[in-house]
Amino acid sequence: MAEVTIKQLAEDVGAPVERLLKQMVDAGLEKRGEGDIVTDSEKQKLLAFLKQSHGESFSEPKKITLKRKTTTTLKASGTGANRSINVEVRKKRTYIKRSEAVNDIDAQKQQDIQRAAEEAAAKERETEVEVALQNEPGMEATAEVVESVQQEAANMDTQEAEAAPQASVDESVSATTAGGSQEKAGVAADQEAEDAQKSEARKTSKHRRNKEDSEVRREPADAEDLKRREKHKPKPAPQLKSSKVIAIEEDDSSEEAPRRARQRKKKSKVVQDRSVQPIVREVVISDTITVAELAQKMSVKGVEVIKRLMGMGIMATLNQSIDQDVAQLVAEEMGHKVKLLQEDAVETEVLESISFEGESKSRAPVVSVMGHVDHGKTSLLDYIRRAKVAAQESGGITQHIGAYHVETPRGMISFLDTPGHAAFTAMRARGAQCTDIVILVVAADDGVMPQTQEAVQHAKAAGVPLVVAVNKMDKEQADPDRVKNELSALDVIPEEWGGDVQFVPVSAHTGDGIDDLLEAVLLQSEMLELTAVPDAPGKGVVIESSLDRGRGSVATVLVQNGTLRHGDIVLAGEYYGRVRAMVNENGQNVQEAGPSIPVEILGLNGTPDAGDEFIVVPDEKKAREVAEFRQNKERQTRLQRQQAASLENLFENMGKGGVKELNIVLKTDVRGSLEALIGALAEIGNEEVQVKIIASGVGGITETDANLALSTQAIIVGFNVRADASARKIVEKEGIELRYYSVIYNIIDDVKKALTGMLAPEFREDIVGTAEVRDTFKSPKFGQVAGCMVLEGAVYRNKPIRVLRDNVVIFEGELESLRRFKDDVAEVRAGTECGIGVRNYEVKVGDIIEVFDKIRVERSL
């Protein structure tokens, strides 16, 4: 039991605090206020006092008997076969508790001492006392028995001075042996009294022999002195407490029984001293951890952790991930020690172990060509490379990041050709981040366009200097001053106007100004003082990645520092692998690639995202560990993002009709185009319809994609990829819609048309005529008929109507009949009287009948 205050104890027992304080004072416990602490020993003392005050006695000795039986088998050899003999050993032990009657023995002892002192004072000589003692047979034996009992009690007190009262043993002992044990206690008390009488008599006789002359005068003083000495004398047998248990083993010898009993008591004492304490564990918590994992680390049930989270206002399931801070609060609240684990320690260790020390040498600049679509970026690069790259692109537009390096008379330059279409915003941003100089191509006849502004923003965000190439100067509509004025509004000031941006007029068609452009680029690179360490391990960025059926995963990388060699172990984003082959932009195999050189590498176990950094690591095991760590981190982040999105949209979508979704399975040839398409399709739609990408990936359309589209009722979109034979068979058999595209414009337009067709129709009401009720009369065929005058427009028999009374719509329905004189007519124009029969409604004089028409309005996104 833990220590509690007097107030808490009073609440537990259901008694007033004042009454409890009075009872504690009566029991000899000094307590002043209700905030004082009550220990276990004080509780026991108070309980004993209350029981005595109610007439209950503690003098009943109790005992418990334990029986144990063991059976063994002995093999006896003799004539014939061996015989087995079963030997059964039975033991019985009885545990007896001495009662609280020892207090009565104390009082009896005091009376015996006083009586012995009085008798000793009355005797005159020592010889008379000795004769009296000799007349008592067995006295010496009794004294020896008492001394042995005292010695045993002293040993037991020494061994168990700190043992707590064994209340459970007291309650389990039977009360059937109360009488016999009380007789034994009485015999022990008589023996102690006789021993005390003998010792007091001897002391009194010795005192009287020394001072016979003052025997009469000091007789009362001697009696008081004996009482005072007996008061300070150590108490022998009565010191045994009620919690002391004597074990008697009936089949053991009298000498071994006390020893074994003491050993058992010592063991029980050790067990009792062990207080039940909660196990404090060291919980290692990573950046993200699920509720089930946290519960397992603390060795508790997951429900307990969920309850703690609910108390903190967090609703979570067993498999849901929680962040490190929340997990730390839960673990500390449950009494455990927390050790925060930085999961990226493995990644940091690998990256820090790679050294890029060495001699720095100048490197070629990496130049990105940016601009609006159809402004001539790729054509300009064609003229520089003396190649026809633009003719190979579908639709004449660039849909991938092309990486090339060109040897010029003035030095080597590496070019990155980025797409200009709006869907490739992320690809342009990646191109600006991994480049040194940006060539901004602006058509002289078109000026600054939206993607031109975006390219300027990307270049400024990356801190990359600009060189403006004013293209299409060979056209008659060319106006370079217009380009300068529009770019100056974007804070791109030409050098001629006092700025720091070089403007070079060029023509990709005729080649005019190309040399000046290269000169400007090399001049800008000299000002940047670009350097790298060629002897270090390779490091750079992934430009593009794709999945080739014959070659596997192919990644286009740009080496920014060090040298990438054939056979190196490359870690790129969430994937790793050994470089099995390296191919340059001309399709030639190379053994190494230095700084600023773009190459294609084969051998990765997946297609990394465009923009991921790659690095050469010395150990494949470390590379695998880092890649797996990144994959797990990305998966947990994605799950958390989905969970947060679902919780945010839970109440928004409550009560609303279901949003119509167009399910799409999207497959592309390269990773960059996949990201661009996913981003472009996600922007299409509104609160009624939207695009849902069921699955996406790089590579051809497989049987798995076809089965997934069949189960989700999705359409399959292939961008520069085709379906294999098994996938085509499923598509033809099940009637799945499969579409191939090579231009991104067409995908976006077709998806917009499909979503437009899914929109709910919208109707507009046009009022075509009004009529005023002048009179009403009954007709045996149609019931009530209203005589009306057509005020505006025309009244048609087959169109819906409204009835207005005091300019308030009171009825909406349809006409039952329309007559001009006695003839049924289809319409009645303005200024003409007619008879109108309204179905299921009675009109009054002065009402206005309004005829309207519902027109369906085509909706668009």
Curated annotation (Swiss-Prot):
Keywords assigned by UniProt, alphabetized: Cytoplasm, GTP-binding, Initiation factor, Nucleotide-binding, Protein biosynthesis
GO molecular function, one term: GTPase activity
Alphabetized PROSITE patterns for the sequence: G_TR_2 (PS51722), IF2 (PS01176)
Entry GO terms, CC: cytosol
Comp. bias (Polar residues): 148-158, 169-180
Compositional bias (Basic and acidic residues): 115-128, 210-228
Gene3D superfamilies in the record: P-loop containing nucleotide triphosphate hydrolases (3.40.50.300), Putative DNA-binding domain, N-terminal subdomain of bacterial translation initiation factor IF2 (3.30.56.50), Translation factors (2.40.30.10), Translation initiation factor IF- 2, domain 3 (3.40.50.10050)
Pfam short name (any one): IF-2
Region (G2): 396-400
Signal peptide: none
Coiled coil: none
Region G1, residue ranges: 371-378
Residue spans of biased composition, Basic residues class: 260-269
Region (G3): 417-420
Stretches the record annotates as G5: 507-509
Domain tr-type G, chain residue ranges per copy: 362-531
Region (G4): 471-474
Predominant place of localization: cytoplasm
Subcellular location: Cytoplasm
Binding site residues for GTP: 371-378, 417-421, 471-474
Family affiliation: Belongs to the TRAFAC class translation factor GTPase superfamily. Classic translation factor GTPase family. IF-2 subfamily.
Annotated function: One of the essential components for the initiation of protein synthesis. Protects formylmethionyl-tRNA from spontaneous hydrolysis and promotes its binding to the 30S ribosomal subunits. Also involved in the hydrolysis of GTP during the formation of the 70S ribosomal complex.
Designated name of the protein: Translation initiation factor IF-2
Organism of this sequence: Hahella chejuensis (strain KCTC 2396)
Gene name per UniProt: infB
